Design a protein with these regions (language model features):
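Active-site beta-loop-alpha junctions enriched in small/polar residues
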Residues: 7-9, 37-39, 97-99, 118
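Catalytic domains of carbohydrate-active enzymes, especially glycoside hydrolases
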Residues: 19-35
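Conserved, mostly hydrophobic/aromatic
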Residues: 5, 24, 105
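Glycine-rich anion/phosphate-binding loops
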Residues: 11-23, 75-76
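Active-site beta->alpha loop and helix N-cap motifs at the rims of alpha/beta catalytic domains
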Residues: 58-123
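Glycine-rich, proline-tolerant flexible connector loops at the mouths of alpha/beta enzymes
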Residues: 31-70
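Conserved small/polar residues in nucleotide/adenosyl-binding loops
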Residues: 136-138
């Protein structure tokens, strides 16, 4: 199975996200994976050093909250992205980063959850996702 990762490659534009799904199909993908989070559910708006991205990255000096706020896929896009993927014959699924994301994805009948590498120690999230869906990829 070939999975195309959407991540933040839409650059904040819904049209780009939709075209990315269609391009994934043209490129031979079988599925497209989103990331489902909001900045306010995965970090704090805080100016302490632990909340600033380290030197040496392209986001050097940026606050995590601000980066996540720019990079996330707006939740109001998810339904349309799932629909476009289905029209294209693709499986659409996501990495939920918290329980509220799982709940939103449940409403879209998301067929699988991919637990992000960064979240593999978040046992409450994994247990919650597993209580909703039997197919989870870690």
């Amino acid at each position: 199975m070939i999975v195309a990762e959407m991540s933040a490659n839409h650059n904040g534009k819904k049209e780009t996200a939709i075209e990315t799904v269609r391009a994934a199909k043209r490129a031979g993908a079988d599925a497209v994976k989103l990331q489902t989070y909001r900045a306010d559910t995965i970090t704090l708006r805080c100016d302490k050093p632990d909340f600033i991205i380290n030197e040496g990255s392209i986001w050097d000096g940026q606050y995590f909250y601000d980066l996540y706020e720019q990079a996330y896929t707006p939740w109001e896009w998810h339904e349309e992205l799932f629909h476009v993927a289905k029209e294209e014959g693709l499986i659409c699924f996501s990495s939920p980063f918290d329980k509220t994301a799982v709940d939103m994805l449940e409403a879209l009948d998301c067929p699988v959850y991919k637990i992000a590498s960064f979240e593999i120690t978040d046992i409450p999230l994994i247990e919650y996702a597993a209580s909703k869906l039997s197919l989870i990829h870690i």
